[in-house]
Amino acid sequence: MLLGVNIDHIATVRNARGTTYPSPVEAALVAETHGADLITMHLREDRRHIKDADVFAVKNAIRTRLNLEMALTEEMLENALKVMPEDVCIVPEKRQEITTEGGLDVLAQQDKIAEFTKILTDAGIRVSLFIDADDRQIQAARDVGAPVVELHTGAYADARSHAEQIRQFERIQNGAHFASDLGLVVNAGHGLTIHNVTPIAQILAIRELNIGHSLISQALFLGLPEAVRQMKEAMFRARLLP
């Protein structure tokens, strides 16, 4: 199982004081050195954390893959074609939200998503769609030509009871198997922590987890190398469980 380290909140800390540090590039390189299989960055329309220059700098510096999260807009499409990341994950975006609140509604935007997917694919960029674990959305993702889906784990991570968490886990598990049976590559992410990652990492249909906020939070106390190492170890151990 692969670990994508999202470094958005390195930029959040930097931007809080308008300094040049901490450096997203340095964070990306440290994460790579200590177990990250790819680096994820979300270039939001309001540039609240990652800036355009960060994306170019990280793409030029890293040795693994860059997974660029972006909204379904012409501006972001143009940026992606300039940066040429290995992967683009199309996500829903609202300016007033604190973080991404739900999955992309592929059914409601099939034509536009299909158009963006073809343009990016023709440029050699692999496209992923960040969606809820809903069979209709998963089928729509396949129909528009996306080879990858990233299942939104936020409802699982934020569940307020054990029963609700189990319900959300089963939804993700079923969605992952459905997507895999359709021939899609399945990733997952959002709200995952060292404390809740194990059940998700046990789902063999899921190939990659993208984790950011909790990793950066842990890094405040452990250091980024140890935070990445512990997460990767937790994922590895989960795969060994019966």
From Swiss-Prot:
Which Cys pairs are S-S linked? none
User: SUPFAM superfamilies recorded for this chain?
Assistant: Pyridoxine 5'-phosphate synthase
- Molecular function per GO: pyridoxine 5'-phosphate synthase activity
EC category = transferase
Q: What is its main location?
A: cytoplasm
Extract one GO cellular component term from the record.
Answer: cytosol
Q: Name one Pfam family in it.
A: PdxJ
Reaction(s) catalysed by this chain's protein: 3-amino-2-oxopropyl phosphate + 1-deoxy-D-xylulose 5-phosphate = pyridoxine 5'-phosphate + phosphate + 2 H2O + H(+)
Q: In which pathway does it act?
A: Cofactor biosynthesis; pyridoxine 5'-phosphate biosynthesis; pyridoxine 5'-phosphate from D-erythrose 4-phosphate: step 5/5
Q: Where in the cell is it found?
A: Cytoplasm
The active site lies at: H42 (proton acceptor), E69 (proton acceptor), H190 (proton donor)
Q: Where is this site: Transition state stabilizer?
A: E150
Which keywords accompany this UniProt record? Cytoplasm, Pyridoxine biosynthesis, Transferase
**Single Gene Ontology BP annotation:** pyridoxine biosynthetic process
Q: Does the keyword Transferase apply?
A: yes
Annotated residues that bind 3-amino-2-oxopropyl phosphate are located at N6, R17, G191, G212, H213
Q: Tell me the residue numbers annotated for binding 1-deoxy-D-xylulose 5-phosphate.
A: D8, H9, R44, H49, T99
Enzyme Commission numbers on file: 2.6.99.2
- What does the function comment of this entry state? Catalyzes the complicated ring closure reaction between the two acyclic compounds 1-deoxy-D-xylulose-5-phosphate (DXP) and 3-amino-2-oxopropyl phosphate (1-amino-acetone-3-phosphate or AAP) to form pyridoxine 5'-phosphate (PNP) and inorganic phosphate.
Subunit details: Homooctamer; tetramer of dimers.
What family is it from? Answer: Belongs to the PNP synthase family.
Q: Which PANTHER family match?
A: PYRIDOXINE 5'-PHOSPHATE SYNTHASE (PTHR30456:SF0)
Q: What is this protein called?
A: Pyridoxine 5'-phosphate synthase
The organism's lineage?
A: Bacteria, Pseudomonadati, Pseudomonadota, Betaproteobacteria, Neisseriales
Q: Which gene encodes it?
A: pdxJ
